[in-house]
């Protein structure tokens, strides 16, 4: 990323096949204030290992003190626990705790629409000027990327989510 300082945080302990809890919390604690962190959640790619509810809460507490923008990438909602609600815990918790959150969600995999690339991005932020700047940037990126994406994939997702019978069947 041009002009952006990037870093890494420890996440997975390959010897024990689990979250590197101590390393992860240490690295998050030492992040610069007012920075951004990206989490791939539920069915974490490529490890398929996710933090526990308690670990997410601890991560939230650390990052809230540092005013970090938290970016969640969720492509596999429903795959980790089998429940859409359970798999959305981290995003909802961070929002409830007052974080600035960016949430990218894909339906391409969990709805079996691989070639359609259906998804969306949500921003949770209380600062009006920041919201307006983000929206302006997103509109620009959208026009530069694809302008007018096909609508049928989003219509399928809307139909499934709007129908209790289809949602239960899915």
Language-model-detected regions and their locations in the chain:
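Conserved core segment of the aminotransferase class I/II
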Residues: 96-170
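Alpha-helical subdomain
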Residues: 56, 78-87, 140-147
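Short secondary-structure boundary/capping segments
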Residues: 53-54, 85-87, 117-120
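Substrate-binding/gating loop at the entrance of the active-site cleft, primarily
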Residues: 1-5
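Short, electropositive alpha-helical surface patch
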Residues: 87-98
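Active-site phosphate-binding strand-loop segment of PLP-dependent enzymes
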Residues: 13-79
């Amino acid at each position: 990323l041009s002009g952006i300082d990037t870093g890494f945080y420890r996440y997975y302990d390959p010897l024990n096949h689990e979250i590197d809890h101590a390393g992860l919390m240490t690295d998050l604690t030492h992040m610069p204030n007012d920075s951004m962190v990206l989490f791939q959640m539920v069915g974490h790619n490529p490890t398929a290992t996710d933090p526990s509810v308690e670990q997410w809460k601890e991560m939230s507490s650390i990052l809230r003190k540092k005013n970090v923008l938290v970016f969640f990438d969720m492509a596999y909602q429903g795959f980790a626990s089998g429940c859409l609600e359970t798999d959305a815990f981290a995003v909802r918790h961070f929002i409830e705790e007052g974080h600035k959150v960016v949430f990218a969600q894909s339906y391409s995999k969990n709805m079996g629409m691989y070639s359609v690339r259906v998804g969306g991005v949500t921003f949770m932020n209380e600062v009006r000027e920041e919201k307006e700047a983000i929206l302006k940037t997103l509109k620009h990126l959208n026009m530069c990327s694809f302008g007018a994406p096909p609508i049928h994939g989003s219509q399928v997702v809307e139909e499934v989510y709007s129908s209790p019978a289809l949602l239960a069947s899915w």
